[in-house]
Swiss-Prot record:
Tissue expression per record: Red blood cells.
Origin species: Pteropus vampyrus
Phosphoserine modified-residue sites: S44
Modified residues (S-nitrosocysteine): C93
Biological processes annotated in GO: hydrogen peroxide catabolic process
Gene for this chain: HBB
Name the UniProt record assigns to this protein: Hemoglobin subunit beta
Modified residues (N6-acetyllysine): K59, K82, K144
Gene Ontology cellular component list: blood microparticle; haptoglobin-hemoglobin complex; hemoglobin complex
Modified residues (N-acetylvaline): V1
InterPro entries: Globin, Globin-like_sf, Globin/Proto, Hemoglobin_b, Hemoglobin_oxygen_transport
Phosphothreonine: residues carrying this PTM: T12
Domain Globin: 2-146
Family: Belongs to the globin family.
Function: Involved in oxygen transport from the lung to the various peripheral tissues.
Length: 146
């Protein structure tokens, strides 16, 4: 992902304030509620029968944190996202058979959750930088599908 110095500073500056457990759980939970067909990849998570069940599900929260921990790793290697996410791409493609469009959906949901958590601090410029990053991460995760 090509970010200007200003964009990189905006992304990393805000990310330093992100509570990955909270934001990750909310982002994954919202993905599962807003796009219910994504739930089929999470059969082992138990009760996903309603929005409140999804948002309160400890397995959703734990996996959301895991997802954002990986995203954090990607932020350290913006110049090599494909390399950083190669193993995860392979896992999601070959073993889990996740539709790569879901990575784009989750990235967009993450941007919404960040906007909700950071309000005025999440300026249009910060949003634009994050959109570039989540698109780059989604492309890297979809890499093994091509």
């Amino acid at each position: 992902v090509h970010l200007s110095g200003e964009e990189k500073a905006a992304v990393t500056g805000l990310w330093g304030k992100v509570k990955v457990d909270e934001v990750g759980g909310e982002a994954l939970g919202r993905l599962l509620v807003v796009y219910p067909w994504t739930q089929r990849f999470f059969d082992s998570f138990g009760d996903l029968s309603s929005a409140s069940a999804v948002m309160g599900n400890p397995k959703v929260k734990a996996h959301g944190k895991k997802v954002l921990d990986s995203f954090s790793e990607g932020l350290q290697h913006l110049d090599n996202l494909k390399g950083t996410f190669a193993k995860l791409s392979e896992l999601h493609c070959d073993k889990l058979h996740v539709d790569p469009e879901n990575f784009r959906l989750l990235g967009n949901v993450l941007v919404c959750v960040l906007a909700r958590h950071f309000g005025k601090e999440f300026t249009p410029q910060v949003q634009a930088a994050y959109q570039k990053v989540v698109a780059g991460v989604a492309n890297a995760l979809a890499h093994k599908y091509h």
